[in-house]
C-alpha cells in the first residue's frame, strides 16, 4: 500500500475497489506486513461502495514450512477499524488439487454475505471447463 493509492482512494469516488494478493504475491513473493494490512483496514474511501478484494490464493502455500509467513486477519482489522463491510476475502484449493477438482470459499461481513446470497441464488455451477476441451 502506498500513500499514492491511499490518496487516490480517498479523493476519487469513481475508484470502487482494489484487488490484492496479500501472501506470496506474484511475481515478487511479497507478504503484506501487519502495517500494510492495517493501512488497508483504515482506508477512508470517497466511494461508499468501495471494496477490498483480498485474494488469499496462497493461504496454505508456505514457502518455508519451518517459518510460515504470518498474515494478519483483514476481516478483523476492517471490523476493528469501523469498516466491516469493506472487504471480501476468498481462496480456493485449485492449486493444491487435481485440475477441475478445486473448491473455493469466501469470507465477509454478515451484510456482505447476505448480498452475495441474493446474487448466488441465480447462479449455477457448470461443468468443469478444463475437462470439456
Kindly give the residue locations of the regions a language model identified.
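PLP-dependent class I/II
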Residues: 1-133
